[in-house]
Amino acid sequence: MSILTYLEFHLYYTLPVLAALCWLLKPFHSQQDNLKYKFLMLMAASTASIWDNYIVYHRAWWYCPTCVVAVIGYVPLEEYMFFIIMTLMTVAFSNFVMRWHLHTFFIRPNTSWKQTLLVRLVPVSALLAITYHAWHLTLPNKPSFYGSCILWYACPVLAILWLGAGEYILRRPVAVLLSIVIPSVYLCWADIVAISAGTWHISLRTSTGKMVVPDLPVEECLFFTLINTVLVFATCAIDRAQAILHLYKSSVQNQNPKQAISLFQHVKELAWAFCLPDQMLNNELFDDLTISWDILRKASKSFYTASAVFPSYVRQDLGVLYAFCRATDDLCDDESKSVQERRDQLDLTRQFVRDLFSQKTSAPIVIDWELYQNQLPASCISAFRAFTRLRHVLEVDPVEELLDGYKWDLERRPILDEQDLEAYSACVASSVGEMCTRVILAQDQKENDAWIIDRAREMGLVLQYVNIARDIVTDSETLGRCYLPQQWLRKEETEQIQQGNARSLGDQRLLGLSLKLVGKADAIMVRAKKGIDKLPANCQGGVRAACQVYAAIGSVLKQQKTTYPTRAHLKGSERAKIALLSVYNLYQSEDKPVALRQARKIKSFFVD
């Protein structure tokens, strides 16, 4: 094999992988990820530089003098690059593997202190003992030198990280192991290539000479495995600390969620959260969040799955918002209770909303929960308590508007004309679109741009129109409701739908009515979807995917020629395809040439 320069090694084996990971994670990248990358790169570069100069000085490994661009101290410039590239690769891969589940759910305040002390102290004691023995075995020109240097470099850091996040790490075994093993195996393979090509060489005088596989010294395998373990553990520790900070925002942050804080202040807060044991956290808060997500998981598996493409902060708060909307909707739809009882519960919900939003965001929220606990289900109370965390983000008007939509249904108020259709859809859908958008904008410290809010409300109309077009028969048979404007129908058609006999209108008539509504949705969609491009970049993919998948139901209806389906839907594979392409903004609309669209996206990626 010809000699491979160190720079060529990066160009062929590390930078392409890093670039692929960056592209893969681009739709999900958040400010919290920025902090993680910056902090860990700083730690890796500062500590590894000293350590590596020490071992190169003692000839634990050396490099081909003609294979490097420059040398700083005793170490090639490309080696300093390796510190940064390896850190970014492993942390980025860990982010991708771990992002699909909320970090909050791996924090357990009800864990016993005895278990915590056992889980923390035993591994920490073992790691410190290894560090002590490795330090005393670090003798230059001895076979134990290189391996011992690796152990005393990595083990103390592992001990500190385990002390703060050990239990969290144990609760994520599969994700943690994948994040360690896959980058380690790849880097070991790349190391074999470099050693075989003569880019660098491991000294037999300061190593055991044992090989894991040909051209892979056991010390090199140990190095990549331990350093990647440090990076993954550090990622877990930061994820846990950030989850705690998000749950326990100070009143000052709640008063002004867009107020930026310095990197030093953020690191200081993370250190505080890192040191907090789970038992010192409010268990009720975690229970409420868990119950809220159970409501979401049971009520809408598709939304629960789709929410995974949002950043964890946004995903968590959107889940809380959805749980509140679903819990209140269930109160009004509970057929086991009389209409009057449901009206009373709706009035109580409205009182809760007014109590919540009448309070200043700068002061702790005080709610008389006993008043509600005696009259509402326990799961609903948990959703309400979790919802109070969004007080500083939301406005009262869209929440009240949503409750007006429930009242509309409880009173079985008819949709007389297109103005009623728009008003009802605004209550039950535009209001939710506005609230979701406010949550999204708040997490990225952006102003609540009125134009973006207006587009979100329009998108709510689009999705509700498609929903009504899809469910003409379902709403008729299950609810005895007609959400089509009665001005579109003859009197006898309205009566047939309200009596649960929508099918008697015939397939062609049902198709015509549904496509008329889909046409109105398509017309609004042209303007509404422009608002997505103004959202924070890490949320655009999730919003675009959710909207495109749902709006695509209209396309399914358009494809029907003779039969109106009882409940039109996309095939699972088609839904996944649209969602995936939408996340990366590669979904092809029918009115744009494919090549032009792809060229624009490729240009956007490199420019951005």
Swiss-Prot record:
It is found in: Membrane. Its EC number is 5.5.1.19, 2.5.1.32. In the N-terminal section; belongs to the lycopene beta-cyclase family. Residues 1-240 are annotated as: Lycopene beta-cyclase. One of its GO terms (biological process) is carotene biosynthetic process. One of its GO terms (cellular component) is membrane. The keyword Isomerase applies. GO terms for molecular function: 15-cis-phytoene synthase activity; geranylgeranyl diphosphate synthase activity; intramolecular lyase activity; lycopene beta cyclase activity; squalene synthase [NAD(P)H] activity. Keywords: Carotenoid biosynthesis, Isomerase, Membrane, Multifunctional enzyme, Transferase, Transmembrane, Transmembrane helix. This is Bifunctional lycopene cyclase/phytoene synthase. It comes from the Eukaryota. Pathway: Carotenoid biosynthesis; beta-carotene biosynthesis; Carotenoid biosynthesis; phytoene biosynthesis; all-trans-phytoene from geranylgeranyl diphosphate: step 1/1. The gene is carRA. It catalyses: all-trans-lycopene = gamma-carotene; gamma-carotene = all-trans-beta-carotene; 2 (2E,6E,10E)-geranylgeranyl diphosphate = 15-cis-phytoene + 2 diphosphate. It holds the Pfam family SQS_PSY. Residues 247-608 are annotated as: Phytoene synthase. Induction: Strongly induced during mating of two strains of the opposite sex. InterPro entries: Isoprenoid_synthase_dom_sf, Lycopene_cyclase_dom, Squ/phyt_synthse, Squalene/phytoene_synthase_CS, Trans_IPPS_bact-type, Trans_IPPS_HH. It is a multi-pass membrane protein. Bifunctional enzyme that catalyzes the reactions from geranylgeranyl diphosphate to phytoene (phytoene synthase) and lycopene to beta-carotene via the intermediate gamma-carotene (lycopene cyclase). PROSITE patterns: SQUALEN_PHYTOEN_SYN_2. CDD domains: Trans_IPPS_HH (cd00683). The chain crosses the membrane at residues 3-23, 37-56, 80-97, 117-137, 150-170, 175-195, 218-238.
